[in-house]
Amino acid sequence: MKTKKNLFTAIVTIVLIGTYTISACAQTKNGIGRIELQRHDISTLGREMVQAHIDFEPGTAFGNHNHPGEEIIYVLEGELEYIVEGKSPVVLKKGEVLFIPAGTIHSAKNVGNSKASELATYIVEKGKPLVQLIK
């Protein structure tokens, strides 16, 4: 009986690790990797919180886009340049933060020589796409 339980535990563990790995890999495109860490309803009706870890390889950029709500960025490592509509470009390093108002067009680029990462927290309208690309 103990052997069956151990086998079951091993299979479940392998499936979960495989699912996480596939999910993480599926979110990598053009040198930018995105892993959604959590998504929860909040006390404001029709809104939710989404948190993601985003990696940028050196020289990669995520072009103009916006979100259906506020974004708070915390730089985990590296140097990221943010261009926010109506403001001068700003370069943030590890430990620095940036607030982006709802619907504001912005872009991000890794301007350093190594990988850069950010923790992005969004308070957005539930049911709407998290990112809208702007041409």
Model segments located where?
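Mature N-terminal segment immediately following signal peptide/propeptide cleavage
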Residues: 42-64, 73
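Short, conserved beta-strand element in jelly-roll/cupin
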Residues: 55, 67-82
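Short histidine-centered beta-strand/loop micro-motifs
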Residues: 62-67, 84, 109-111, 133
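Histidine-centered metal-chelating micro-motifs
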Residues: 61-63, 81, 98, 102-109
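Extracellular/periplasmic catalytic domains that process cell-envelope and extracellular macromolecules
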Residues: 46, 66-67, 74, 91, ...
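Ligand-binding loop in jelly-roll beta-barrel domains
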Residues: 89, 104-127
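Short acidic-glycine-tyrosine-enriched beta hairpin
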Residues: 56, 86-103
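A short, N-terminal "cap"/entry segment at the start of jelly-roll beta-barrel domains
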Residues: 3-50, 83, 99, 129-135
